[in-house]
Amino acid sequence: MKLFLVSLIILISTQIVKAEINQLFIKNCATCHSVQKGDKTLRAGPNLWGVVGRKAATETSYTMYSDAIKKSGIVWNEKNLNKWLTNAGAFIPGTHMYYMQADESVRLKIIDYLKTLK
């Protein structure tokens, strides 16, 4: 019985954390970005499915990348995503995205969420 209760608590806690991270993504990113595998719906930003580990400006269904991001040569790893989400325009001047998230805990949760999209 104790094992069942502990398992249930862990399951519920995990679901609460997933829901919180999903809400953070919706609030901060979903207006401009899809995260559905294969979604080619035109939005203000590229689909973020599989973004972690991908070279910037290579999501083929998105065609509105700035020259600055095309020429950046960066790969979206945790370090680069954190800099990008802190201040995209300062990290890659000339980009079309001007998102800034001062709260590091929010940035890290969004990055953790993006890492699951594969």
Whereabouts are the PLM-identified features?
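Sec-dependent signal peptide recognition
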Residues: 1-8
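Generic alpha-helical secondary structure signal
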Residues: 19, 23, 46, 79, ...
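Residue-level detector of functional hotspots within protein domains
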Residues: 2, 32-34, 81-85
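Sec/Tat signal peptide C-region and signal peptidase I cleavage site
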Residues: 12-19
